[in-house]
């Protein structure tokens, strides 16, 4: 009995999903803000971040201290 009920429910769910998709595909919806401007907002935000970090990394004068090799000399060890 269980497989029969399960298959009936699956068919019912598939049909309802198919009907919903068919209903949605026939509707004409107007584009919202994200449809109109989403890609432009994303591209301008990415450009702003890249330009800002490029300026900070190259022009502000931050000492980044990437590697101490060749700049750090060990102090002489003193016996006490």
UniProtKB/Swiss-Prot annotation:
Classification via SUPFAM superfamilies: Mitochondrial cytochrome c oxidase subunit VIIb
Transmembrane feature ranges: 33-59
Coiled coil (residue ranges): none
Residues exposed to the Mitochondrial matrix side: 25-32
Protein's UniProt keywords contain Flavoprotein: no
Pathway participation: Energy metabolism; oxidative phosphorylation
Keywords: Membrane, Mitochondrion, Mitochondrion inner membrane, Transit peptide, Transmembrane, Transmembrane helix
GO biological process: cellular respiration; central nervous system development; mitochondrial electron transport, cytochrome c to oxygen
Cellular component GO terms, alphabetical: mitochondrial inner membrane; mitochondrial membrane; mitochondrion; respiratory chain complex IV
Topological domains annotated Mitochondrial intermembrane: 60-80
Primary location class: mitochondrion
PANTHER family per UniProt: CYTOCHROME C OXIDASE SUBUNIT 7B, MITOCHONDRIAL (PTHR16716:SF0)
Function of the molecule: Component of the cytochrome c oxidase, the last enzyme in the mitochondrial electron transport chain which drives oxidative phosphorylation. The respiratory chain contains 3 multisubunit complexes succinate dehydrogenase (complex II, CII), ubiquinol-cytochrome c oxidoreductase (cytochrome b-c1 complex, complex III, CIII) and cytochrome c oxidase (complex IV, CIV), that cooperate to transfer electrons derived from NADH and succinate to molecular oxygen, creating an electrochemical gradient over the inner membrane that drives transmembrane transport and the ATP synthase.
Assembly and oligomerization: Component of the cytochrome c oxidase (complex IV, CIV), a multisubunit enzyme composed of 14 subunits. The complex is composed of a catalytic core of 3 subunits MT-CO1, MT-CO2 and MT-CO3, encoded in the mitochondrial DNA, and 11 supernumerary subunits COX4I1 (or COX4I2), COX5A, COX5B, COX6A1 (or COX6A2), COX6B1 (or COX6B2), COX6C, COX7A2 (or COX7A1), COX7B, COX7C, COX8A and NDUFA4, which are encoded in the nuclear genome.
Family: Belongs to the cytochrome c oxidase VIIb family.
Identification of the protein by name: Cytochrome c oxidase subunit 7B, mitochondrial
Source species of the chain: Homo sapiens
